Amino acid sequence: MTWRSGGTTARWTIETNKREAYGLPRFEIEEMRYGLFTCPYQRLPLERAFADAKAFGYDYIELWGGRPHTFAPDLLAGQLREVLRLQEQYEMPVEVYTPEHNAYPYNYMLGSESQWRDAMDYLLRSLRCGRELGAQYTLISVGHSGFMPEKARRERLCRSFRLLAEEAEHLNHRIVIETLTPYETDHFTHAEDLKALLDEVGFGNLFGMCDVVVPFVQGETAAHYIRVLGARMVHLHLADSDGVSDTHLLPGEGKIPFMGWLDELHACGYDGRATIELVTHYIDTPSEAARQALESIRRMEA
């Protein structure tokens, strides 16, 4: 099996019985594509992230939607034209738009009804931004509910995603939903939570993903998401983990057995995009971290 990324070709041998064990058909995986996440660049001009992505050999951008760069209201007020220009200049597409929404001032799972409406209005505008940017997905995660009773929490979650899915359908856009670690949320931390939400809301424009830190800190594997979600698993966040927090580290600097996990992901049939998700831990050295992260992943391919 051939796996191509950023001009590098790696050979992986995946035994047929592994695929059969997962009940998946045989096929050739042609490409794993890597994205740069712009969050740690928030103290620098956004153009620096695009320039680095091009120079280091990334395949796409996952755009963090927060100030000063690409906060949804700012994009809709005119800033979007600059992001489109950067995509064209650097030949670097924005494939995922990830609005900031689990910290101040927005969390649709927490607060009063008026605060929920405010958060949803923001996310509805974010969906429009994702569509206008040309992104394939807008990424929505599920924040802390403030220990809301389970029934009320479930109703609020499903109500939120029905509204978002209806708007995405109107825009001809898609949403990818992310679980979080137990250090970030009091619910929605497992692949089964994702499947249950997708099944209950029932819109075909909703998909799931896996941030590999999430299963790792809970004694699970990323491949479990593919077994549970099947073809509805469309995106991946790669970062290493210390195993005891939500900290996202450079691949190879933590405890995740990346080579084995990547092997298993491919055996399960995942051949999509993978954003190397470095966040504020590397806010002082985003360029060096972005370069090191991709180099580390490529060494693991060899």
Region spans (language model):
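Residue-level detector of anion-binding/catalytic polar loops
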Residues: 59-60, 93, 136, 174, ...
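Conserved alpha-helical segments that form or flank metal/cofactor-binding pockets of metalloenzymes
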Residues: 86, 95-97
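Conserved beta-strand positions in the central sheet of alpha/beta enzyme cores
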Residues: 62, 96, 139, 176, ...
